[in-house]
């Protein structure tokens, strides 16, 4: 079953309305479960949400995006702040927010050679330029095993 067919099935089962546009996987999405594009009507979904959280959570994410979709084409308020959107989302039991990822976001671990203070960073830092904030000691990168 393709993604578009799955979204069409959810639309008919949960909203009683057909989907007239396509749905696509978009692996560039990092912090969101999906996106609705009012300009051309297509939907994008994050494939990692299905992999990490399972089909039940993914179905709720699809419902969320379909709320945007159907309200937009009905000419009603389709933004998160609109009462129409909040009411429809509660009615179909969709997710308001995407669950956080279970993966750790810190990639680089540093420690001070003098006081032992540990620093975790997403981005790499220049060890020749930066020192410990506590004691001004030299930093070293910890091995990740």
Swiss-Prot record:
Needed co-factor(s) = Zn(2+)
- List the keywords (alphabetical): Cytoplasm, Metal-binding, Zinc
User: Where are the catalytic residues?
Assistant: 65
Write one Gene Ontology MF term. zinc ion binding
Q: Which residues bind Zn(2+)?
A: 64, 68
| Record's subcellular location | Cytoplasm
Q: Which residues form the SprT-like domain?
A: 4-140
Cofactor stoichiometry and binding remark:
Binds 1 zinc ion.
| Cellular component terms (Gene Ontology) | cytoplasm
Any one GO biological process = response to stress
Superkingdom in the source lineage: Bacteria
Chief location of this protein within or outside the cell: cytoplasm
Pfam families from the xrefs? SprT-like
Family according to the record = Belongs to the SprT family.
Output this protein's name: Protein SprT-like
Instruction: Print the organism lineage.
Output: Bacteria, Bacillati, Bacillota, Bacilli, Lactobacillales
């Amino acid at each position: 079953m393709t993604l578009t067919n799955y979204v069409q099935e959810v639309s008919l089962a949960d909203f009683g309305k057909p989907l007239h546009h396509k749905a696509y996987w978009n692996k560039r999405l990092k912090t969101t479960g999906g996106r609705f594009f009012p300009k051309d009507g297509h939907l994008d979904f994050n494939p990692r949400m299905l992999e990490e959280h399972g089909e039940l959570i993914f179905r709720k994410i699809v419902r969320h995006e379909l709320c945007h979709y159907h309200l937009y084409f009905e000419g009603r308020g389709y933004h998160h702040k609109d009462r129409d959107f909040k009411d429809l989302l509660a009615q179909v039991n969709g997710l308001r927010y995407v669950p956080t990822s279970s993966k750790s976001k810190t990639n680089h671990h540093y420690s001070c050679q003098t006081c032992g203070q540990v620093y975790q960073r997403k981005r790499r830092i220049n060890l020749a330029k930066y020192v410990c904030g506590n004691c001004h000691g030299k930093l070293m990168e910890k091995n990740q095993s």
